[in-house]
């Protein structure tokens, strides 16, 4: 862990340098490949890890090798992972989905921004230096039209987004021929449907049933289509965002790019400080992954941080502002009802959700029902006009092990189920947020309750943390719970960084949180038995047994750390081909001994076979040619 502390000026300058010098970069010995769909502009990016051949024999001067297949893996890095693409953060990413959106002819450009706040910001010349220059003209649905992916799915339409996703979710496993790599243990799926091959029609079916969502605002055409659902591999979200006391636009864009490089499937911008609007524009125009927000945070800024002064009108204006910028999903704490707030009084840690506490305070101060609940149908109308998905927030999630699975938590969950049905009336896509802090033996009930109460809408959880005793290591405590709930059926895991409960994460914290959660998600996929989930593990194990060190580094989730740890003790190039590692040394390496045992067993089998043949030869009189009936 680095102990170097940079000043705010140094941090900002470093981030600016990162942005100014940014270019498409591949991981070591990997290359970007594209799999094309039924039309030329459906080009699905993947990363292909190139492997070295296996030495199978021959002489010192004439060695014989067997090729190892390249391993394709899911890639969230967008254009940032392609060395052939010219990156310019000032201009933003190419608008991948724009032709598909235009071809549907069910949306139209707006003459002016719908949000009064947006109009005010655009009229402020003092913000010119901060503002993203290539602003899009926002679109919304034409009158009487529904433009959500859920609407299309229910109409039986397979969109280009759905075909893109089907190709992406198969992760190129159809390219793998090796039986060794394709071997997979049967999983325990807890009722999930996991087809051997994911088709566009399967994607459509899952979206139509509400079991999966495709977060894809029509005003975020730069995003690469992805899906969140129980019957697909588990996804991971990364949180970024500035605060009133730290971080800049440059640093948040840097964290966005960094997050996608390390595997974030979606990113939530949780900014609460100055220039929220401008920061979000820069993030959206440069994001290849869906962006989520918690609109109540910005609405609170608009009333100077006084929760009691919040109004539906201010919140509605914020929804319009963010929807027209391109936010793909909103976290809405509409399930924090007035009658549930007293249930938290006997908790050890009360209400720990920022959004939940804001709404609870508003309800109590006005002694009125949550205005998000009261105006939920209007929220749905706004979301339907731009295809913004709803992430129904768990404002009453437990903030400590002692408060897990209590009355307040599950009362809110049941209300979220009721709201899900209302959102579906408007063809709005929905996922459900979950806890929190839950000990291991109480985790599965959360998944069971969610499936039953929320009609199998995708579950999206923060961990959960399985113990409260490890500040500084909560990416570990939560990674355990994340792997478990992912196995039970959770569709997306919100990462937790080492700074959880302590401070805002920096770049290295973001990476640590993402690697931890990619491990948890992959472990869950293995346990569920997702077809193809074991390919990379098998490739790694084969490389490990054959002492192909470079391949081991390159197959790792974090090749750089794997290489660095190896090189701490065996830095010489000869260490990259050694048939041992520094832990056991050359005489006690279990892999080396196993290879020797295998070679010895093979030799013994040949020797035994020859002895058996000799015995048979002598028993038959030692004749070279036998009569037919004796043969």
Curated annotation (Swiss-Prot):
On cofactor binding, the record's note says: Binds 1 [4Fe-4S] cluster per subunit. The cluster is coordinated with 3 cysteines and an exchangeable S-adenosyl-L-methionine.
Provide the reaction this enzyme catalyses.
Answer: 5-amino-1-(5-phospho-beta-D-ribosyl)imidazole + S-adenosyl-L-methionine = 4-amino-2-methyl-5-(phosphooxymethyl)pyrimidine + CO + 5'-deoxyadenosine + formate + L-methionine + 3 H(+)
Question: Can the keyword Lyase be found in this entry's annotation?
Answer: yes
Sorted alphabetically, the keyword list is:
4Fe-4S, Iron, Iron-sulfur, Lyase, Metal-binding, S-adenosyl-L-methionine, Thiamine biosynthesis, Zinc
Question: What does the record give under GO molecular function?
Answer: 4 iron, 4 sulfur cluster binding; carbon-carbon lyase activity; zinc ion binding
| Entry GO CC | cytosol
Q: Where does [4Fe-4S] cluster bind?
A: 581, 584, 589
The record's section on Pfam families has: ThiC-associated (PF13667), ThiC_Rad_SAM (PF01964)
A Gene Ontology biological process in which this protein takes part is:
thiamine biosynthetic process
Q: What is its EC number?
A: 4.1.99.17
Residues where Zn(2+) binds: 437, 501
Q: Which cofactor does it need?
A: [4Fe-4S] cluster
* Binding-site list for substrate: 239, 268, 297, 333, 353-355, 394-397, 433, 460
Pathway assignment reads: Cofactor biosynthesis; thiamine diphosphate biosynthesis
Q: Which superkingdom?
A: Bacteria
Do the record's keywords include tRNA processing? Answer: no
Q: Which PANTHER family match?
A: PHOSPHOMETHYLPYRIMIDINE SYNTHASE, CHLOROPLASTIC, THIAMINE BIOSYNTHESIS PROTEIN THIC
For this entry, the protein name equals Phosphomethylpyrimidine synthase
Q: What is the lineage of its organism?
A: Bacteria, Pseudomonadati, Pseudomonadota, Gammaproteobacteria, Enterobacterales
Q: What gene makes this protein?
A: thiC
């Amino acid at each position: 862990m680095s102990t170097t502390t940079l000043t705010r000026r140094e941090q900002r300058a470093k981030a600016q340098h990162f942005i100014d010098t940014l270019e498409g970069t591949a991981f070591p010995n990997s290359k970007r490949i594209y799999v094309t769909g039924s039309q030329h502009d459906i080009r699905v990016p993947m990363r292909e890890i190139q492997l070295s051949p296996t030495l199978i024999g021959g002489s010192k001067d004439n060695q014989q090798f067997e090729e190892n297949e390249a391993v394709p893996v899911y890639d969230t890095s967008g254009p940032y992972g392609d060395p052939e693409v010219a990156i310019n953060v000032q201009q933003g990413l190419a608008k991948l989905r724009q032709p598909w959106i235009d071809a549907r002819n069910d949306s139209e450009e707006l003459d002016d921004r719908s949000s009064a706040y947006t109009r005010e910001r655009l009229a402020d010349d003092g913000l010119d230096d901060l503002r993203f220059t290539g602003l899009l003209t926002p679109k919304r649905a034409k009158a009487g039209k529904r433009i959500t992916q859920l609407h299309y799915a229910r109409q039986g339409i397979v969109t280009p987004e759905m075909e893109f996703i089907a190709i992406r979710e198969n992760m190129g496993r159809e390219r793998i021929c090796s039986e060794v790599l394709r071997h997979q243990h049967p999983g325990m799926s807890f009722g999930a449907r996991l087809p051997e091959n994911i088709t566009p029609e399967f994607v459509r079916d899952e979206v139509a049933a509400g079991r999966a969502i495709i977060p894809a605002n029509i005003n975020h055409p730069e995003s690469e289509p992805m899906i969140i659902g129980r019957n697909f591999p588990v996804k991971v979200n990364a949180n970024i965002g500035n605060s009133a006391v730290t971080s800049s636009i440059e640093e948040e864009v840097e964290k966005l790019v960094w997050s996608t490089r390390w595997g974030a499937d979606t990113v939530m911008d949780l900014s609460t400080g100055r220039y929220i609007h401008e920061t979000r524009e820069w993030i959206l125009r440069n994001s290849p992954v869906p962006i989520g927000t918690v609109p109540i945070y910005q609405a609170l800024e608009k009333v100077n941080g006084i929760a009691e002064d919040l109004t539906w009108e201010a919140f509605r204006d914020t929804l319009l502002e963010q929807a027209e910028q391109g936010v793909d999903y909103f976290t809405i704490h509409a399930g924090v009802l007035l009658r549930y707030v007293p249930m938290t009084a006997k908790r050890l840690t009360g209400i720990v959700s920022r959004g939940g506490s804001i709404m609870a305070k508003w309800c109590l101060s006005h002694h009125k029902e949550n205005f998000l609940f009261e105006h939920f149908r209007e929220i749905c109308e706004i979301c339907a006009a731009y295809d913004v998905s709803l992430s129904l927030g768990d404002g009453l999630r437990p903030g400590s092990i002692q408060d897990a699975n209590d009355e307040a938590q599950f009362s809110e969950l049941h209300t979220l189920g009721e709201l899900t049905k209302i959102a579906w009336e408007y063809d709005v896509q929905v996922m459900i947020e979950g806890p929190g802090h839950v000990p291991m033996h109480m985790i599965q009930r959360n998944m069971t309750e969610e499936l039953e109460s929320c009609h199998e809408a995708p579950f999206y959880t923060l961990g959960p943390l399985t113990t409260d005793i490890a500040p500084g290591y909560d990416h570990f405590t939560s990674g355990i719970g994340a792997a478990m709930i992912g196995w039970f059926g959770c569709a997306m895991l919100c990462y937790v960084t080492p700074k959880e409960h302590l401070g805002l994460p920096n770049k290295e914290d973001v990476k640590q949180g993402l690697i931890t959660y990619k491990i948890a998600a992959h472990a869950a996929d293995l346990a569920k038995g997702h077809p193809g989930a074991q390919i990379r593990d098998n490739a790694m194990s084969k490389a490990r047994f054959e002492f192909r060190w470079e391949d081991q580094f390159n197959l790792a989730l974090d090749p750089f750390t794997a290489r660095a740890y190896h090189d701490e003790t065996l830095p010489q190039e000869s260490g990259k081909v050694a048939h041992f590692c520094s832990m056991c040394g050359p005489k006690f390496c279990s892999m080396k001994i196993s290879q020797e045992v295998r070679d010895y067993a093979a030799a013994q089998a040949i020797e035994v076979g020859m002895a058996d043949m000799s015995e048979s030869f002598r028993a038959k009189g030692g004749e070279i040619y036998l009569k037919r009936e004796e043969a």
